[in-house]
C-alpha cells in the first residue's frame, strides 16, 4: 500500500461505476435528442409545385407539431421516489422559443438529506446548449465497493456540480464531493505488516475532498478524478513508521 496506490484505489471506486452510468446516459441522450430538435424546412425545400396538377404544399408554421407545457414526473433514486416536473417540451424549440426544463427535488429520507436535479434542454438557437445541474446533501455511502480496492462501510457525502453539452456532442463538466466521517475497509495483505497497519489507520477518515471533471465528446471523453486522499495516506504512512520506530527503541 502506498500513498499513490491509495489514491488510485479511490479513483477505481468512483470511476468504474460513474463511467458505466454515464455511458448509459449518453446512449439515452442520443436517442432522445433528434425528437427534440426538428430541423426547420421550407415548402420550397420539401415540395416542387407542378403546374396544372394538384399538390400539397407545406407552409411555414408558427407553432410546433408537438408541445407539452407541463407534466408531473417521478423517478426511483436509491429505492426512494423523487417527484419532479417537466415544462415546455417540444419537437421544434426554434419555433416555440423556450428551452425545456426538467426539475426533480426531494427532502430528507434514510438515503440522503436532500436531492436536486435540474436539466435545461435549450435547442432554440443555432447551437444546442443543454445543461445538467445536480445537488446531493447527506448522501449515505454505506456499501459502496470495488473488487480489490476496498469498501466504504459508512459515511456521508455532499455532491454538487454541472455538465454542459454543446451541439449534442461536446462535454464540459465539473463535480465536487465532500465525504465526511468515512469508514473505509481496505483488504489485508498477507505478510505485509506495515501495509496492514496503514490500512487500519485509514479505517476512519474525517473528511475526503474529491473533484471530478469531464471533458471531450460523448463518444470520446475523459474523466479526471482528484482528491486529498494521497495526503491523508501520506500522514498515515508517517504515523505507522513512527510507531514501528518506537518499537525498536
Can you say where each PLM-predicted feature lies in the sequence?
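A generic structural signal for solvent-exposed, polar alpha-helical segments
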Residues: 32-35
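A short, compositionally biased domain-edge/stem linker segment
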Residues: 53-54
Amino acid at each position: 500500500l502506498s500513498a499513490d496506490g491509495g489514491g488510485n484505489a479511490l479513483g477505481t471506486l468512483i470511476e468504474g461505476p460513474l463511467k458505466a452510468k454515464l455511458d448509459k446516459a449518453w446512449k439515452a441522450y442520443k436517442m432522445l435528442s433528434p425528437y427534440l430538435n426538428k430541423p426547420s424546412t421550407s415548402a420550397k425545400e420539401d415540395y416542387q409545385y407542378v403546374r396544372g396538377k394538384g399538390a400539397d404544399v407545406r407552409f411555414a408554421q408558427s407553432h410546433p407539431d408537438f408541445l407539452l407545457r407541463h407534466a408531473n414526473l417521478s423517478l426511483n433514486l436509491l429505492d426512494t421516489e423523487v417527484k419532479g416536473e417537466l415544462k415546455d417540451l417540444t419537437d421544434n424549440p426554434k419555433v416555440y422559443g423556450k428551452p425545456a426544463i426538467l426539475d426533480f427535488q426531494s427532502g430528507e429520507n434514510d438515503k440522503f438529506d436532500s436531492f436536486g436535479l435540474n436539466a435545461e434542454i435549450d435547442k432554440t438557437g443555432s447551437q444546442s446548449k443543454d445543461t445538467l445541474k445536480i445537488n446531493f446533501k447527506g448522501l449515505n455511502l454505506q456499501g459502496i465497493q470495488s473488487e480489490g480496492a476496498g469498501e466504504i462501510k459508512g459515511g456521508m457525502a455532499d455532491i454538487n456540480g454541472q455538465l454542459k453539452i454543446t451541439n449534442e456532442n461536446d462535454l464540459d463538466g465539473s463535480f465536487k464531493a465532500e465525504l465526511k466521517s468515512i469508514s473505509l475497509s481496505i483488504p489485508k495483505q498477507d505478510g505485509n505488516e506495515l501495509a496492514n497497519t496503514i490500512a487500519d489507520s485509514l479505517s476512519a477518515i474525517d473528511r475526503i475532498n474529491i473533484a471530478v471533471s469531464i471533458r471531450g465528446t460523448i463518444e470520446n471523453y475523459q474523466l479526471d478524478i482528484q482528491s486529498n486522499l494521497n495526503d491523508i495516506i501520506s500522514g498515515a504512512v508517517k504515523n505507522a513508521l513512527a510507531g514501528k520506530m518506537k518499537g525498536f527503541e
